[in-house]
Amino acid sequence: MSKRESAKYKIDRRLGENIWGRPKSPVNRREYGPGQHGQRRKGKLSDFGVQLRAKQKLKGFYGDISEKQFRKTYEEAARRKGDTGENLIGLLESRLDAVVYRAKFVPTIFAARQFINHGHVNVNGRRVNIQSYRLKVGDVVEVREKSKQLAIVLEAVQLAERDVPDYIDVDHNKMVATYNRVPGLLDVPYAVQMEPNLVVEFYSR
């Protein structure tokens, strides 16, 4: 595995789970046999440990966003009416980087963040270079004309490992996506189990 790939999958290795469902993730195989290289059996996590792990997993999925930004998103979710965990998922999935990734304009969430930073994306006809930009229902996200033939875009469209969720309409011929509705937890095609209720418990301590 190259140095670049190693950095990309450090979150998977840290959590011991393939959180994006990528075929090349190192956790898909045992690197060493049991007991070798000082591996130890992990003890049972405390309630705090379980809650912390749930937070790290959800935060990591969206590109390991900063604790400050993640907590701010949680606090906004808590202020809204309804279930805080469901609100949290809806807010995270309405981020521009999440929608660019979900629409299969790029292969990874990290690529989505870089793609946006470099000015390759329009929202409602205007260039937006803020990863955390919050989309509203009905917003149209488009890959800019000069960027549509980039290798990273052409690669992502062909990925068979994930499908576009039904809360996003995509035309890959035009490279345009429409954010149709705010999803709940059961709508989101996570590759592993996410537990926003435990994240709520973590911040409610």
Swiss-Prot record:
Q: Where does the S4 RNA-binding domain lie?
A: 94-157
Keyword Ribonucleoprotein appears in the UniProt entry: yes
Q: Which Gene3D superfamilies match?
A: Ribosomal Protein S4 Delta 41, Chain A, domain 1, RNA-binding S4 domain
Extract the coiled-coil ranges from the record: none
The UniProt entry, under Pfam families, shows:
Ribosomal_S4 (PF00163), S4 (PF01479)
GO MF annotation terms? rRNA binding; structural constituent of ribosome
Q: What is known about what this protein does?
A: One of the primary rRNA binding proteins, it binds directly to 16S rRNA where it nucleates assembly of the body of the 30S subunit.
Indicate what this protein is called per its UniProt record.
Small ribosomal subunit protein uS4
Species in which this protein is naturally found: Brucella suis biovar 1 (strain 1330)
